[in-house]
Structures are given as structure tokens and as C-alpha cells.
Regions:
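Central cavity-lining transmembrane alpha-helices of secondary-active solute carriers
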Residues: 67-86, 105-107, 295-308
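Multi-pass alpha-helical transporter architecture, strongest
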Residues: 212-219, 421-440
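Glycine-rich segments within core transmembrane alpha-helices of 12-TM secondary carriers
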Residues: 161-185, 387-398
């Protein structure tokens, strides 16, 4: 028995090591594509798809049908987390990350190549829905694997910093998505954009996918999983084990992510919609001006992500996140309504910068916190499942609820809604144990 343990330790010590630069690129590239895709699809679903993928008729009905395809990805993501989590916990992190990125990449590029309703009729929206489902499926396995790639390759005292690498992909992807639409608005007429220009961002994502595949194929398996595989300790059905033996931490992990998702979708989708909608319903600001504001604010998001990782390594995940979540509640109740509601571009810019900086602070530690909640044999499935179920509870409904609350009760109730979601996260954090010194 002692000889076996010695052999396993020797195998782990002699296992090939991934360089930090390779881990950084391989882990953040998928998240960058995820957020790049989120924004280009959300924009196209409102501006383009109702006109080219759905029968001509009631414009409102066409828009709702288009937005329904956007929601398909949220349904597909938990399925993807179970599917890719199964193979990630049984076969390995590396091969599963390659498969999830390939699934996501093919589906995204396919959207940019789809024929329109005018060309192939009812098949066009059906193929769009299928491609969107494929995107969600790939996305469901992407983040958890990327977070594990980072944290399972990290030195023990720097796990939160390494875990912030995949989180950096979010501001990078969002920045490039906004930049792409700004560039297209300068170079193309509205007619050119509606005819073929909208396809460019989807097809361009192939470049990011190829870079990601090149780096990921050359990776070695993480030392933590290599040890489990050598000992043949993989479980047969990771999702079954997760939902029978680790229900409490799965639920807590889901609610820990809730404030992050709600904050991001309110700061981006809702804020863009409210800011550009003509007064008196919205602020009536020019679309390009709001895009510029978001691009500048996203820089604050990106800066805060690694800072949050460093803070979580220094003070612990739980204490850091409790403070940050409390700040989100204060922002939602006392800063959000007066700054956004002012209609003053400078104050709206301040609102976006503060809100997205808080987003960086709350999102940064998640790359370490969620994986550390689960044992190695179900870590891929557990981290992915919590992350993606939370996207349904937080991300998928946040813009709709915020818009409805603002229209019926006023902007301050949007802040109360955000504060309530953050309060649920705060409760989950208080019920969670500290994981900083936990061995993976």
C-alpha cells in the first residue's frame, strides 16, 4: 500500500508541467469567446435576426421569436455542463476543453454562414435555433474546464490569482465585441450591415477558436486530475454523485454566482437598452456614445479581476466575497438609481464604471471559489453545473425583470431587485466554509 502511494506521488511529481503563459491563454480564450458571442448574438437578435430569419409580419412578434433563440443557450448550458462535466471528470480536463471549444466555435461560425428565411424558408430559423443550442452546449462545458485548468495548475498560495485568468476573458471578449460593432458602424452603411456585415463578428470568432485549439492541444493534463486517474478514483456518473452526495455545496455555489450574473446583465443588456431607448421611457442617448462608455467601463472590469484574485489569496475567498457582495448591495440601493436616472452622460459613465468594476471584483475570485467547493472526482461537473444553473436564475431573466420593474414602478426598484439577488449571494457565502487552504 505504501509502495502504491509512493508510486502515485512520484507520478504526480514527474508529470509534465504546463507553463504559466500557456495556462493563461488556454484558460481565458474560451471565456473571451463566450462573452464575445454573448454580446454579438444579443445585438444581432434585436437588430438583425427579426428581419432576416423570421417571416415578415408583426415586428414585435418577430423580435420576440428572435430573442427566444437567444434564450435557448441558457437551457442548453446546464445540459452542456452535465455532458462535458461527465467526460471532464472521467476522461480528463484537456480533451474535454478541446471538445467544448470546438463545439462552441463550430456553432458560432455556423451562425455567420446561415442562409436567410428568404433563401430557405422555415429551415432558416430552425437552423439558427440549432446553432444557438450548440453554442450553449459548448459554453456549458467551457467555463468549468477553464477554471479547473487554471486552478489545478496553480501553486497552492496563488490559486485565486490563477483562477482569475479565465475570468479575464470576460472583459476581453466584451471589449472586442463592442469594438467590432463600433468599427462596423463606421465602415458600413446600415444596408450593408443588415445584408452581410452582421456576419463578420460570427465568422471572425473562428480566429479566436483556432488560437484556443492550438494552445489547448499542446497542454498536458492537470497534475491534480492525473493523480486521480492514476489511482483510478474517477466516479462512474459524476452528475449522479454530485446530486446525491454534494447537493448542499451545489446549491450554495449556484447562489454564490447569482449576484455576479444579475449585476453583469443589468450593467450591460439592461443599461444599453434603457440608455438608448428614446425619452421619456429611456434616456435617449446615442447608441455609439453608450458603446464607447461601455468599452471604457469594461477596462475597469478587466483591471479589477486580477486584483480580486490577489485579495482572495491574501484574505480568503469568503471574507473577500462577503465585503464585495455587501458593496454591490450598497451600490444597487444608493448609487444605481441617481446616477443612471440622471441622464447626464458623465454620471451614466460613472455608474457604468463603478458597476462594472464591482463586476470584476465579484467575478475574479469565482475561478477559484467554485472549483474549490468540490472534490476532484466531481469538480468539473460541480463547478460547471453551479455556474450554468445560476445563469438561468440570474442572467436569463435579469434584463426582462429590470425592464418590467422600471416601466411599472421606477428605476429604484431595479436597484432593489439587484440588491435582493446580492442578498441571496451574501446568505450563501455566510453558509459556505473558507476554501483558501483546502488541498485540491
Amino acid at each position: 500500500m505504501q509502495a502504491t502511494a509512493t508510486t502515485l506521488n512520484s507520478e504526480q511529481e514527474n508529470a509534465p508541467v504546463n507553463s504559466r503563459n500557456k495556462v493563461v491563454v488556454a484558460s481565458l480564450i474560451g471565456t473571451a469567446i463566450e462573452f464575445f458571442d454573448f454580446y454579438i448574438y444579443a445585438t444581432a437578435a434585436v437588430i438583425v435576426f427579426p428581419h432576416i430569419f423570421f417571416p415578415q409580419g408583426d415586428p414585435t412578434a418577430a423580435t420576440l421569436q428572435s430573442l427566444a433563440t437567444f434564450a435557448i443557450a441558457f437551457v442548453a448550458r446546464p445540459i452542456g455542463s452535465a455532458l462535458f462535466g461527465h467526460f471532464g471528470d472521467r476522461v480528463g480536463r484537456k480533451v474535454t476543453l478541446v471538445a467544448s471549444l470546438l463545439t462552441m466555435g463550430i456553432s458560432t461560425v455556423a451562425i455567420g454562414l446561415l442562409p436567410t428565411y428568404e433563401t430557405i424558408g422555415i429551415l432558416a430559423p430552425l437552423l439558427l435555433a440549432l446553432a444557438r443550442f450548440g453554442q450553449g452546449l459548448g459554453l456549458g462545458g467551457e467555463w468549468g474546464g477553464a477554471a479547473l485548468l487554471a486552478t489545478e495548475n496553480a501553486p497552492p498560495r496563488k490559486r485565486a490569482l490563477y483562477g482569475s485568468f479565465p475570468q479575464l476573458g470576460a472583459p476581453i471578449g466584451f471589449f472586442f465585441a463592442n469594438g467590432t460593432f463600433l468599427l462596423l458602424s463606421w465602415l458600413l452603411t446600415d444596408e450593408q450591415f443588415m445584408t452581410w456585415g452582421w456576419r463578420i463578428p460570427f465568422i471572425f470568432s473562428a480566429v479566436l477558436v483556432l488560437i484556443g485549439l492550438y494552445v489547448r492541444v499542446s497542454l498536458h493534463e492537470t497534475p491534480v486530475f492525473a493523480k486521480v486517474a492514476a489511482a483510478k478514483k474517477q466516479v462512474k456518473i459524476p452528475l449522479g454523485t454530485l446530486l446525491t452526495k454534494h447537493v448542499r455545496v451545489t446549491v450554495l455555489g449556484t447562489f454564490i454566482m447569482l449576484a455576479t450574473y444579475t449585476l453583469f446583465y443589468i450593467m450591460t443588456v439592461y443599461s444599453m437598452t434603457f440608455s438608448t431607448t428614446p425619452a421619456p421611457v429611456g434616456l435617449g442617448l446615442p447608441r455609439n456614445e453608450v458603446l464607447w462608455m461601455l468599452m471604457m467601463a469594461v477596462i475597469g472590469f478587466g483591471v479589477m479581476v486580477p486584483i480580486a484574485g490577489l485579495l482572495a489569496d491574501r484574505f480568503g475567498r469568503r471574507p473577500s466575497m462577503i465585503v464585495i457582495t455587501s458593496l454591490i448591495i450598497l451600490f444597487a440601493l444608493f448609487v444605481f438609481p441617481p446616477l443612471l436616472g440622471s441622464g447626464n452622460p458623465a454620471l451614466v459613465m460613472a455608474y457604468l464604471l463603478i458597476g462594472l468594476s464591482l463586476m470584476g471584483l465579484t467575478f475574479g475570485p469565482m475561478g477559484a471559489l467554485l472549483p474549490e467547493l468540490f472534490p476532484t472526482e466531481v469538480r468539473y461537473t460541480g463547478a460547471s453545473f453551479s455556474y450554468n444553473v445560476s445563469s438561468i436564475l440570474g442572467a436569463s431573466v435579469a434584463p426582462y425583470i429590470a425592464t418590467w420593474l422600471q416601466a411599472n414602478y421606477g428605476l429604484q426598484y431595479v436597484g432593489i431587485y439587484l440588491a435582493a439577488m446580492a442578498a441571496l449571494t451574501l446568505i450563501a457565502l455566510l453558509l459556505t466554509h473558507e476554501t483558501r487552504h483546502q488541498s485540491l
